[in-house]
Amino acid sequence: EGYIQPDESCLKQMFFRKPGLPILMVEFPDGRRVPYWNTFYQEVHGRDYLGQMDLNIKSEKVWDFYRETLKKIASYGAAIVRLDAFAYAPKAPGKKNFLNDPETWEFLQQIHELAAPLGLTLLPEIHAAYEEKIYKTLADKGYATYDFFLPGLVIDAIENRRADYLAKWAREIVEDKISTVNMLGCHDGIPLLDLKGLLPEDDIRSLIDLIVSRGGMVKNLHGQKNIYYQVNATYYSALGESDSKMLLARAIQMFMPGKPQVWYLDLFAGKNDHEAVRRAGESGHKEINRTNLSASDIEEALKKDVVAKQLELLRMRNTHKAFEKGAVITVAGEGPKLSIRYDNGEAYALLTVDFEAGAYEIELS
């Protein structure tokens, strides 16, 4: 029956998330094998399939599904909807499979028009190098953007004892009024490749090597160069399982401009779970950072100083008036010194960091 042989000029435009072509051959009861677009992973066991299948956004049935899903989410009381990997949705023969312009932004606008009447705010999730300025495009169009630069910048600042790159990014957020949602660890990996154009490439490579040396993992790239990847590790293990570094990182996150979100495993100082990776088998690298915690695990973790102090930082960020809407944020950083200050009326909060000493202080009104 032959093979699908893509034109090399088309392949060069592709942005792959797994080895091989993003195509899954689905066998129908009549014996026909039909190719379906499949950007992300798949498992095939005879006639059984497990994975993520791309939707045809030109189909009215798909838009009916979007409408029903957004209505259901809104009925549950949701306020923010994350659009996971949305930039892979628009594609057409002869074009890229990722971030097509203007189709990507037209698609996002269509989703916005469905979500806004329901009181839903969209949070588009997109990984791209800093140098591509996609975060800026999202901001200019009025959307919040994930701060995928912060996790790597914080590790760089702590390990290399310098505030320069972190402070530069924080100032850009403030000066350009970019609305962000930030994190340290998350359900996926640490997105160091996103730092291209912000951090020197040799330094990015060194950070990847450092985290891997501390037990982190990178998926098997099968020798391909145009595959995006993250470094899979808990943030605590990426920092060498150092309580002081974890607390410093969390303090920086709480003062960083934007809305902080916290991955449960880092809050409880979770370590790389290599046993979970082993149980998951091939392509199970993400399980390193997804350990299931029992109630007793959590009760035991709450006794740890590193957990209690992180919770104190979260309470401060949630309750102190300096962090309320309308605050004026001032960032200064050079060499090993960093300061971030919030002023809101008579309330203020000031973080000062000495990366050389690996220490921080917080002053509150």
Residue ranges and their predicted role:
Residues 1-364:
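Active-site and adjacent substrate-binding regions of carbohydrate-active enzymes
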